[in-house]
Structures are given as C-alpha cells and as structure tokens.
C-alpha cells in the first residue's frame, strides 16, 4: 500500500503544464483545459507511472486508468477551463481530460467514463 499524499493546487501549478483544446460530450463547444499530465504527476509523486490508477471523485465515483493509456494519450488533471479555475459546480476543482479532438478513437463510453470530474483522490491499484 502506497502512503497517502496530499497535493495542494500550488504544488500542481509548480509542475509543467499542458493545455488541450478539445470537444467533450458534456459541454456545448470546444474548451481549452490547462493542467498537469497524469504521467508527470504520477512520476513526481510515486517515481514512476503505475500499471493502474484509481481516480475518485467528490461524489464517490471511481474509474481506473491504465499505464498504457496514460502513456499513449497523455490525459491531464485539469484545474482550469478557458482560463478560469474550474469550480466544483462546473466539474472541478480537478477534471481528468483526454484530448478527444486529437484522438477521435477515444470518443466513446469507455474513455468518457475515465474522464472523472470533481477529482479528490488517486490511488495506485495493485494487480
């Protein structure tokens, strides 16, 4: 079992950022999302990218992301949408974003389910 690590927004912002402009099924038009690549965040916290990561939300929804997908598609943990911090009522404060416009093959339920919003925890899953 990995020890629990709590990161504040300031710590996330100190890591290299990535932005994606993408369409999502839950919003009316393309938006620009700014955040930290999960690969960068996981390497920063754990020293490497684990085989699987469980991402949980404020409403107790959970989804599992694989290392293969994290490395290949480089999803981000977004904290800004269109240059504004994401509020809880708008799916914040953190939202896992895959660049669907860049990878149209991801635009289906399997990957939609992995784009957890209102993220409040990440746990390494042991196989």
Residue ranges and their predicted role:
Residues 1-127:
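N-terminal intrinsically disordered, low-complexity segments enriched in P/E/S/T
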């Amino acid at each position: 079992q990995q020890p629990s690590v709590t990161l504040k927004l300031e710590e996330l912002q100190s890591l290299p950022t990535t932005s994606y402009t993408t369409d999502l099924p839950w919003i009316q038009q393309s938006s620009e999302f700014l955040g930290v690549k999960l690969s960068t965040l996981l390497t920063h916290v754990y020293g490497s990218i684990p085989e699987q990561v469980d991402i949980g939300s404020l409403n107790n929804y959970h989804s599992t992301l694989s290392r293969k997908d994290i490395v290949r598609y480089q999803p981000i943990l977004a904290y800004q949408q269109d240059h504004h911090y994401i509020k809880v009522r708008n799916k914040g404060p953190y939202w896992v974003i895959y660049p669907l416009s860049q990878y149209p093959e991801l635009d289906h339920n399997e990957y939609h389910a992995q784009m957890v919003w209102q993220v409040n925890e990440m746990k390494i899953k042991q196989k």
